[in-house]
Amino acid sequence: MRNADPSLRLDDPARQLTLAQTLRDLRKRGVRCIAAHPHTDKKILSQADFTGDCCIVFGNEGDGISEEVLEACDEAVAIPMPPTVDSLNVGAAAAVFLYEVARQRKKI
């Protein structure tokens, strides 16, 4: 895996067997791992800090994010939605998260 910052390069990408293992490796290197999770009540998107190095994990539209991956993340963050809306599709959720990242980093 290549990254603009060589210190974030994974030792051996072929050795990274699961997403959870990769997330734990990233956390050891100082990258905050954030799960985009529609059913968390701990933190909403505007309360999360995206100003530093971070990795945002999105689940698939059918099963979401596995418990193992959730546990490997630093925190879970939700997009606030009305009670009648269960979740957004992954493309829409990613767009909302990336807008917030850009806003916090003053790119927009």
Where are these regions (language model features)?
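Post-transcriptional modification and biogenesis factors for structured RNAs
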Residues: 1-108
